[in-house]
Amino acid sequence: MLTDGIRMGRFSMIGNERLLTNGWQILKFSECIKQLNTGLNPRNHFSLGHGSLKYITAKNLTQFGTIDFSKCDFIDEQAKRIIHRRSDIQVGDILFSSRAPIGHCHLICEKPDDYDIGESIFSIRVDRKIILPDYLCLYMASDYFVRMASLHTTGSIIQEIRISDLMDTDVILPPMNEQRRIAECFKKIDRKIALNNKINDNL
């Protein structure tokens, strides 16, 4: 059973007074992380279409927390080194789409040796003394967080969220043991979905 303030599959604000009891608190996004980087766009830095490594942009992050590698461009080793100096992506980082649809994110669980990211993706490294990456990734995919973040989007054609506005967005933060419970509940759901998909693929 998920905690108060959380509905199965989605987070939902019930009221600050209730959420702020029993160790719950509200922090600014900037207080929960150690660093936020972006990837790099080609421009004069490198070119796409060469090599076998994958170049990930906002369109490749799905609503299910996965990366769709079937629709990505390709880069070579040199381009990846150039991008990585800026992105510095590693296991435990959260990839977050800064462009609409806001809220598509992915938690890196395996070494990202065969891909790197463009400027439309933020790479977020949490402060693990404060928040678990699993919890923050789930929270950033929630309807509540997406609504709050979308209040600050800019652009009439392609909506984007600026780093400064993201940093100022509220994060509802339960105690660490509650974060673990929430994350584990969703992991069990994800494992069940993955198993069902595997069974369906073999039918």
Q: Where are the model-predicted features located?
A:
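Sequence-specific dsDNA recognition surfaces
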Residues: 27-46, 59-91
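Short, ligand-facing micro-motifs at secondary-structure edges
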Residues: 62-75, 94-97, 101-118, 134, ...
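A structural connector/turn signal
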Residues: 83-84, 110, 156
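A short glycine-rich beta-alpha junction/loop motif
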Residues: 98, 114-122, 134, 154-183
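Ligand-binding loop in jelly-roll beta-barrel domains
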Residues: 111, 125-132
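Well-ordered mid-protein domain cores that form the structural environment of catalytic cofactors
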Residues: 141-144, 150, 170-172
